[in-house]
Amino acid sequence: MLNAAPSKIASDWLAGFCRALGENPRAAVDGFFLEDSYWRDLLAFTWNITTMEGRVAIADMLEATLESASPSDWRIRGEPTADGDVVEAWFSFETAVARCEGILRLRNGRCWTMFTAIKELKAYPEKKGVTRPLGVRHKADPNRETWSEKKRRQQAEFGISRQPECLIIGGGQGGIALGARLKQLDVPTLIVEQNERAGDSWRRRYRSLVLHDPVWYDHLPYIPFPEHWPVFTPKDKMGDWLEMYVKVM
């Protein structure tokens, strides 16, 4: 098996693990995971951000969540790669309520690390692509609202006829990104921030600050940075980007 192509190694492992998982979760972990293995879950199984270390913890998690999660339709996505004795592959699967994705790393034919995450809730798909808003009403209507009029009306109604269901404390990049996600799911959300303008949490820091992570790790949902964006973003440039993002999203 170890001399096979990475795609075959990953596909065979995933198919075998899925079969074994349906029969006996603990035996599946013992047979398909290294003793020194890790599984990090972002909501898909545990509805939490949780890291399981070692076979016992992984098996305990699966035994506790497998019935409610009901995972199915596991598939390798893209082309797996190999680096020495490690094979890396992206995969997708579904649970009872969500479409999910993950990445696994196999070492000597067994799982060394696995990451799983919810990508989309089945009952609450985001309004994008073919389901995006039309943005216009093609008929004569003297009471038609423009985009700006509708926005002002919704802002005036917020907190009166429509109450927030989620409160986000802090309007930095994390709070802003979460707010954008919740808006796409039509969840009324209030973000409270001590600074006057979006992005001020970056602008008000020391003069020479740039983001320590390169641009590829810093994208916000829906609007990635343009290709000419600097590798390390200056703080004031990041502040202006966040302010633009809030206005657009």
Regions found by a protein language model. Name each.
Residues 117, 164, 187-194, 236-249:
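Flavin (primarily FAD) cofactor-binding/catalytic cores of flavoenzymes
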